[in-house]
């Protein structure tokens, strides 16, 4: 199954970290956040990636062209450094397609730009490239496959520290509660789409605006609510939180389940983690 990652954003609210690299290349630990996302998808069998490049796209190309497996894997060093034997690898069987989609393009334009690379696919996966989750992907895909929807998106509850204030007509406050304790759901940036999505995107349109509204009007947009772990990386505070998690439980690292049976996760049994038929369409 193909996975489209939108990698063209500049990360304006992460200035200082994203001055020299695109937002998806900002590191969590020793690897960029997009690497963590790709490991997540690969864990479930989806290892064919299409990267929608934009702002400083050459940084992403250079990273993979000079990828150093030793940074995140065990290895044996011998003969004074003349021999380095990797004991395991991150992406032996990954396929990555790099597509320039424009420095200032929006998500809808980037998606249209890669349409030729997903022709023939019935469905595909897509992701904003700046958020991590441990959502059980096969469950989300199974629900989508059984529906007549053209697209499905992950809904999560906001992780903001803001409070909701309920005030009466005269201004007297009736209740204050954390936004996380409300029935508010936001777009989590994880998508599954059928190829028909491209017929609903006109030139210049932002994906979640006009195209998704057309799907809503046709009752063809499916929501998958998930109240487990999800965290975006929009601000310095978000990055700091992800760094702290990376030092400990790192809930999004579902791939650790395969290496350590003692790790608790939301993964289905191995036999259910087969690659599923999901497709992405694009247009360069």
Residue ranges and their predicted role:
Residues 3-5, 51, 126, 151-154, ...:
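Structural beta-sheet core signal
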Residues 122-125, 132-145, 156-160, 172-267, ...:
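Catalytic-core segments of class I nucleotidyltransferases/pyrophosphorylases
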Residues 33-36, 109-113, 211:
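Well-ordered alpha-helical segments embedded in enzymatic catalytic cores
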Residues 1-67, 73, 98, 273-284:
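N-terminal glycine-rich phosphate-binding loop and ensuing alpha1 helix
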Residues 1, 47, 120-123, 219:
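Short coil/turn segments at beta-strand junctions that form active-site/ligand-binding loops
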Residues 60-168:
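Conserved beta-loop-beta/alpha segment of the NTase-like Rossmann-fold superfamily
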Residues 25, 164-167, 223:
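A structural signal for short hydrophobic beta-strand segments in well-ordered beta-sheet cores
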């Amino acid at each position: 199954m193909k996975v489209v990652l939108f990698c063209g954003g500049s990360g304006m609210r992460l200035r200082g970290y994203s001055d020299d690299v695109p937002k998806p290349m900002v590191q969590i630990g020793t690897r960029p956040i997009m690497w963590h996302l790709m490991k997540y998808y690969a864990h479930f069998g989806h290892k064919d990636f299409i990267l929608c490049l934009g702002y400083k796209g050459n940084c992403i190309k250079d990273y993979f062209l000079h990828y150093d497996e030793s940074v995140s894997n065990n290895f044996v060093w011998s003969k004074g450094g003349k021999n380095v034997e990797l004991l395991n690898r991150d992406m032996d069987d990954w396929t990555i397609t790099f597509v320039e989609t424009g420095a200032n393009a929006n998500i809808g334009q980037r998606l249209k730009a890669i349409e030729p690379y997903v022709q023939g696919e019935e469905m595909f996966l897509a992701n904003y490239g700046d958020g991590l989750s441990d959502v059980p992907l096969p469950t989300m895909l199974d629900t989508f496959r059984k529906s007549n929807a053209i697209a499905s998106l992950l809904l999560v509850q906001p992780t903001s520290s803001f409070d909701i204030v309920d005030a009466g007509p005269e201004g007297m406050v009736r209740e204050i509660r954390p936004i996380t304790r409300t029935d508010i759901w936001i777009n989590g940036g994880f998508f599954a789409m059928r190829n028909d999505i491209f017929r609903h995107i006109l030139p210049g349109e932002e994906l979640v605006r006009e195209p998704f509204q057309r799907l809503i009007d046709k009752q063809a947009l499916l929501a998958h609510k998930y109240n487990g772990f999800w965290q975006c990386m929009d601000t310095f505070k978000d990055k700091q939180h992800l760094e702290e998690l990376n030092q400990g439980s790192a809930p999004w690292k579902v791939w650790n389940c395969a290496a350590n049976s003692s790790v608790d996760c939301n993964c289905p049994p191995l036999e259910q983690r087969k690659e599923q038929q999901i497709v992405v369409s694009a247009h360069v």
